[in-house]
Amino acid sequence: MTTAWIVLATIAFYFLLLFIISWITGRKADNAGFFTGNRKSPWYMVAIAMIGASISGVTFISVPGAVYAGSYSYMQMVLGFFVGSLIVALVLIPMFYKMNLVSIYGYLENRFGAGSYKTGAWFFFVSKMLGASVRFFVVCVVLHTLVFEPLGMPFEVNVVLTVALIWLYSFQGGVKSLIWTDSLKTFCLVISVVCCIVYIAKSLNLGIGELPSAIAADHTSRIFFFDDPNDGKYFWKQFIAGIFMVIATTGLDQDLMQRTLSCKNYRESQKNMIVSSGIQIFIIGLFLVLGTLLYMYSGDNLPMKDGKPVGDAVFGNVAWSDGFPIFIGVMFIIGLIAAAYSAAGSALTALTTSFTVDILQADKHGDDARLTRTRKMVHVGMSVCMVAVIIVFYYLNNDSAINAVYSLAAYTYGPILGMFIFGLACRRKVRDRLVPVVCVVSPLICFVLQQNSEQWFGGYQISFELLIINALVTVLGLCMLIKKD
């Protein structure tokens, strides 16, 4: 049995489980079930599901792959993620529950007006569509190499089939189903990583007791970087950026907040947020350990491109190498598709919700049957759009996947973060019709700053802190729009 058919069989079995769970949990779902899970989701299941939703295929492939060049510097940002999650839990979640929002961008309409509301919704649409497509693109490339290319199928067929499968299990139940399917994905993801770590360690003749010291002794396991403020890996850059990254991409993201707000009340939602964030630190640590083991095992036999190691290809190359049993390759595929399909499925649901509620405002017509028809048509439209974006990115991509995702988030989530910061910190009203102008100009200013930072600021490199700068520029722009009493 060839590798391609083994992978296909693995995917088919995995999707069979997803379809069964989705059908059981979502067969009676109405619009409230799709959008909010009827506010009845158990907080501990949401916490487990949140892990699967926040860890995408990019994390699964690129975090271990980035260890060679960046060591464990990513953990500095992950620690910031935890602090950011505390802020989301204590500040944003109670506010969203008090306002009883279906879409969190309804806050912008209440605070500023319709122009700001639509601006936030459109920025989320662009952010999530491009971000989710980039994440899923990474997985499609791996599946194309292992399955579709050996079978003579073009990349476009790969993308259409995989997105269609995601649409099939998510279109009926929405959040009500995703909470349970994503919990399965989280379980598969963790089991996959643990199995790979254990087997690779065994191949290196490392027992469980020897593994910590071997990892600590390797040069790739350095976590903290305090020596050079100009370095993109500098601790305070990554830690502070991680705080604001989570506030923007979790607390102000309809995707992850949609499942968080499906809990019964804000207390349970807070528990979910804090617990899932704590567990995520441990799981990211597993990915980093896996990265060190992969490079220890590969030695000098790293996949290369233009004379440089290709980090994103290391995990797949090792998992499917001749010296490893098929079981490890299968676990790699299970973990990969669990991470990827979880993120893509929840993104489609969130995009459908925001576009239907925020942009089309179909929920305000008072016709539930019409709302259902609109929601289902939008869901199809979001799927088609994602297919198109992935294919375009396939022909344009020339950057490391994880940096592309976070750079994208810094540009598109910055204005959303800025609007919420201004709205919460200042009670003054602004000229709502000019808010879209500020939110478009701000990322353009930040792009110019980032491209010229080393030349203008004595070698200083703007990296992940770009999100903070973008938000601050947006806040300054909104201050200029304050109405005079």
Regions found by a protein language model. Give the residues of each.
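Membrane-embedded helix-loop-helix hairpins and adjacent transmembrane boundary segments
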Residues: 1-485
